[in-house]
Curated annotation (Swiss-Prot):
Chain intervals for the UniProt region annotation (Disordered): 56-76
Protein name: Integration host factor subunit beta
One of the GO biological process terms: regulation of DNA-templated transcription
Assembly with partners or alone: Heterodimer of an alpha and a beta chain.
Length: 95
């Protein structure tokens, strides 16, 4: 699901809100989440999951085109850990 599909679906389910209002709320929520992670803080949405930063240590990588070794710096990357309710709902899906 893309962001625009999410906005469309929420606007349909919440008839009292316009698509523009839903779009604004989604954009503001995502911006706030990004700002919180930028500040090094953790985000927890009970039943859904938590977002945090994990440190990825420096390592030697490989350029896929040339095959040459490349030194990669250490960096922080976003990490999502699903909550218990979300895990249970996904586990119940029969694919």
């Amino acid at each position: 699901m893309t962001k625009s599909e999410l906005i469309e679906k929420l606007a349909t389910r919440q008839s009292q809100l316009s698509a523009k209002e839903v779009e604004s709320a989604i954009k503001e929520m995502l911006e706030q989440m990004a700002t919180t992670l930028e500040g090094g803080d953790r985000i927890e949405i009970r039943g859904f999951g938590s977002f945090s930063l994990h440190y990825r240590a420096p390592r030697t990588g490989r350029n896929p085109k040339t095959g040459t070794s490349v030194e990669l710096d250490g960096k922080y990357v976003p990490h999502f850990k699903p909550g218990k309710e979300l895990r249970e709902r996904v586990d119940a899906v029969n694919v």
